[in-house]
Design a protein with these regions (language model features):
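Core of compact, soluble alpha-helical bundle domains
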Residues: 1-144
Length: 144
């Protein structure tokens, strides 16, 4: 029996380490960091870990908003989504994740483009529109 992508990525601890590194990289990336201006970092990490964990066959359950709702009014461009993907790939390379696993993970993330991108433009570094309403911070009970 073939091991799940979750297992091949190293489980929850490894996924968490990668997600933390991705988020930290994105917060420093001028191509996309403005989109995170009002995002709660802890919530973003928790929700992203749960989403990746569940999507790769792990035991986690993603309970956050769907991607259309979560990114509604963010004005994410095609260029910014591409910058996000490039940051993910750079971190996966830093963590020496194999090409097969990277391809499988990117194939999971790729369909989300249509739910996240609202602006058909290659522009990056756009400001977060004032209409965007971020999700609230996680309660202490949900962080664990």
């Amino acid at each position: 029996m073939e091991r799940s992508l979750y297992d091949r990525l190293g489980g929850t601890d490894a996924i968490t380490a990668v997600v933390r590194a991705v988020v930290d990289r994105q917060l420093k990336d001028d191509r996309i960091n403005r989109k995170f201006a009002r995002t709660n970092r802890d919530r973003l990490i928790k929700e992203f870990v749960d989403q990746i964990c569940q999507a790769t066959g792990g035991p986690c359950k993603y309970t956050g908003r769907n991607m259309t709702e979560a990114h509604h009014n963010m004005g994410v461009t095609n260029g910014e989504f591409q910058a996000f993907v490039e940051d993910v790939v750079a971190v996966l390379n830093d963590f020496k994740v194999g090409a097969t696993e990277q391809d499988e993970l990117l194939n999971i993330l790729a369909p989300l483009r249509g739910e996240i991108v609202e602006v058909d433009s290659d522009q990056t570094g756009t400001s977060l529109p004032s209409e965007f309403t971020p999700a609230p911070a996680l309660s202490a009970a949900r962080r664990d």
